[in-house]
Amino acid sequence: MIGVLLVNLGTPDNPKTPAVRKYLREFLMDGRVIDIPYIFRSLLVNGIIAPFRAPKSAKIYQELWDDRGSPLKYYGEDVVRDLQNKLGDAYYVRLAMRYQSPDMKSALADMQSKGLKKLIVIPFFPQYASATTGSVYERVMELMKDWQVMPDL
């Protein structure tokens, strides 16, 4: 079986301020996103950006979300469903977010249980950037480093 992991940047678990704050912290604490020493990044993100930006961002997320939830997430799920239908049973397609849910760790663990022969990782970004595509591939390698059986990538 061939696994296809579609990865988008991420979205908060809900449009309320605590969830948005959690999302911002996870996203902005990635050293590939804000490329400064950890201590300064931590002070900036946890002391300034997350506390002050989360309430404003939550209001915007509340306007974007609808009955299905986050458009970024449910449109991604729609793509997974359609791609799975097109590719058939020889493929196993999953959606993951680099930050938040559905998380890459769970998606890869699920894919590992399928005994994949090959894994195709497709970031949903229009071009390569260290902060996006680079972060996705780095996280995939980090999560797969202890796998006993490694699929072709």
Regions found by a protein language model. Give the residues of each.
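Active-site-proximal alpha-helix that buttresses catalytic centers in soluble enzyme cores
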Residues: M1-L153
